[in-house]
Amino acid sequence: VLPTPFDEQYDIDLGVMHEMVSRIVDNGLTFGKGVIKISSAVGEGPMLSDNEWPVLLKRAVDAASGNAPVMLGIHYKDTKRSIDDAKRAQDLGAVGLQIDLPFMHHSNQDDLVRFYSAISDQIEIGIMIYNTHWFCQNPVAEYLNADTMLRLKDAEHVTAIKWAVPDGEDYDTMKRFSDTFNVIDNSGQHVRCFKNGGVGYISSLIPVYPAHDLEVLDLLENGKYEEAKAKEDLVNEALAEWMTKSHAKSG
């Protein structure tokens, strides 16, 4: 996950974006080792205008120079506009899309199937579902559950889900579909996810120190779960005081 850099006038700083992408690619985040995700929630995606995110995506794709996959976050738009943005991102070189739940519509499970299937039918790149239950009015009723994920197996371009579940729901239900879809942990339970058949996790530390997460990923992929957890804990403990102060200043 990459943040979106801005200059002192709060305009996107494309030069810094280029440097950031080039740096993490040069430090080993390449095909098979991760995906560069821009315009996500951490990347201020919901706040970017329809004139801003395309130039940001183009710069990231250019900086990756074909050495790493780049995906784009699409946020809480209706089906038609999501399809329009998806096609535009595809033309600009994105290999995939992270697409939020349509939570502004208080969707039921049938709505979710229709929404993601409709987008899948119109594009040729992958879709990772962003299971944003914390934005839903009724998280348990409106998050995309395991039964619904299985209903999407025929949606050709739905390939992955960022997995997290509301309080009281069973995280381990991902085992029912982890042999069909790529499951990416989005709840800080990386070891649990990999034990359940998951293949990745989200990290906001990549822009700062790619080597750490590349090493953790290698350990997880090789079943060295205790070592992976120890490395994560070491870094998390070192950052804990700063994180507390940072969150106190701004959510």
Feature roles, as predicted:
Residues L2-Y143, M149:
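Active-site beta->alpha loop and helix N-cap motifs at the rims of alpha/beta catalytic domains
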Residues Q122, T132-H247:
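Catalytic alpha/beta core domains of metabolic enzymes, predominantly
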Residues T30-G32, A89, L220, K245-A248:
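Short, charged/polar low-complexity linear motifs in solvent-exposed/disordered segments
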